[in-house]
Amino acid sequence: HTPIRRQRQMCIRDRLNHNVNSANWNSQDSIWELEIKDKDGLKNITSSFLFLCGGYYSYSKPHIPNFRNQENFKGQIIHPQFWNNQIDCANKKIVVIGSGATAVTLVPAIAETAEHVTMLQRSPSYIVSWPSEDVKNKFLKKFLPIKITYFLIRWKNILYQSYMYFMAKNYPERIKKNILDLIKDELGLDYDVDKHFTPSYNPWDQRVCLVPDSDLFKALKENKASVVTDTITEFESDGVMLDSGQKIIADIIITATGIELNSLNDINVTIDKDKVNAHSRLTYKGMMLSGVPNFAYSFGYVNASWTLRADLTCEYVCRLINLMDKKGVECCMPIDDETAYGDDDLIDFTSGYFQRGLHFMPKQGNKAPWKSYQNYIKDIFAVRLFSIKDSNLNFYSSKDK
């Protein structure tokens, strides 16, 4: 019954349907002062530690380009971030604008009931099919306990992903050829893979999209969906006119055109009412900010499973708070290191949404612990195994000042 009691206690502490407007660190009292909003209006609460786990993009402000004459379109224009179950795609002609993870996920799902789905892209992304069920996992579970199987399969996937990322960065042409050869095997030699599936950049300069069980390629082969690589001239009443002169008829247009980054979950974070500009600060171990007390944020991997890094971050924050309790101190703060500043952005990615939002994100430094490795093996040592106490992290109480 103990786990059930703990779950109930956690639920009592959870506050759903609350929006955090602002968070101010009060140095005199060593406390975070939060302004939150719920259905009853504004409220104020306090917290001794602030841990942001709201992701890395804005939920309320997606990236929506302004297409010429889009007001002339008579059908629905929908952004996936505002999707709802009332949208009926059955027997409709649908255009999905975009080529990223959202687009390649939506297209095969919608194609099951739609008359036809067109994925309209300005430029292609790398797309790789991946089985939804791991055959090795299925085999090992016949002979081994579930926990051992889970451990082995998890590390198999971690090491394989790390290896593929290493190969892509060091032998990009080889990996590029392998990916394109796999797509040609899926779609046949008569399909124009060079035009529709060959990006202008190298693998892992931007994220590689995974599609489960070749569902996107199956939709293309069955003519339930198609890919058009072109740029948009304007919207018309019944579809989209392209720069090539081609017109795509549509009942619904879905703008899978990307996200907008935010580093602080759209919260106005201040210290004694002075605004915290994340971009002017260094990231400490990829989860704290220089000069900001009792604060952490969860930012995962862009080149592997997001939750691998998120798990490490949660572990570290728990260890940190326990250490503060053990030491009997109120505060911990990464001390700003002027010698660590360089020109390195947090993530070396060329994706449009990263380039648009880098000025919101913290900087990474030129040495540990200010570097963001985006490498699970290195982070295990830096975050999980190494001691929390180091010369860059100051522990203190307000009475010490």
Task: Kindly give the residue locations of the regions a language model identified.
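Single conserved hydrophobic/aromatic residue that forms the stacking wall/gate
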Residues: 1-8, 12-14
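A conserved short coil-to-beta-strand element within the FAD-binding core of flavoproteins
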Residues: 16-31, 225-243
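Glycine/threonine-rich phosphate-binding loop and adjacent beta-strand/alpha-helix elements that clamp
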Residues: 256-324
